[in-house]
């Protein structure tokens, strides 16, 4: 089954172009978010790591309005915009985090490595501490293991109830490093907070490789834990079931799907 995820910055890009005033834009943004779950959306997603960085500040309405004005000037010339203005993006993320909590929807954040336009220094999940502590009712799914900051992300998942660690992209692109990454992640984060995913794209073969390598790495690590006496065989099976499927079923409003 496939379920939609609402991409926050893409929605903002469209509304900045289409709405004539700041207030109309934010009203339309809020209204779209407010009906998301009723329309089948299972999560919001932010790529602030690409656009403005993960050090998301408290909302500043005056600065956000100034950013909107600048972007409208760009839209008038080109017909499109790319929201890379920090004050406005931080302001809209505050609205989104609040709307997500009201609907019991998680919010995904890109963290760590990605395409060449991502500044890795701004993608460290530790930058999200203010958001994590400021929105305790919002479940935050930090994507891609935060690679190469996966130890930091595992620490956040261990100490904050609303932080989840998603393994996508690190599986499969960490390749031979997958077992080492999983060993460190599961040595710190509770397995009930770790989500198997791939972020596979374009070619079906990537999905196959990711599924195979992810299970290979997880099997290696859990076998080691059993042999070391940390887990029983039954506990290792429970951990694998949770990471591969059950945690996602608990987190996302997708029901008990096969």
List PLM regions with ranges.
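Long, mid-chain structured domain cores
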Residues: 1-26, 34
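Active-site-proximal loop/turn and secondary-structure-junction residues that shape catalytic pockets
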Residues: 10, 48-50, 111-115, 146-149, ...
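Short catalytic/ligand-binding loop motif for oxyanion handling, primarily in non-cytosolic enzymes
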Residues: 13-14, 51-55, 115-118, 203-206
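The substrate-binding groove and active-site-proximal loops of carbohydrate-active enzymes
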Residues: 14-23, 80-87, 169-171
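Histidine/acidic residue-rich metal-binding segments in metalloenzymes
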Residues: 24-45, 53-163, 177-195, 213
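C-terminal hydrophobic structural anchor segments
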Residues: 165, 173-226
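Mid-to-C-terminal alpha-helical segments outside catalytic/metal-binding sites
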Residues: 191-193, 208-258
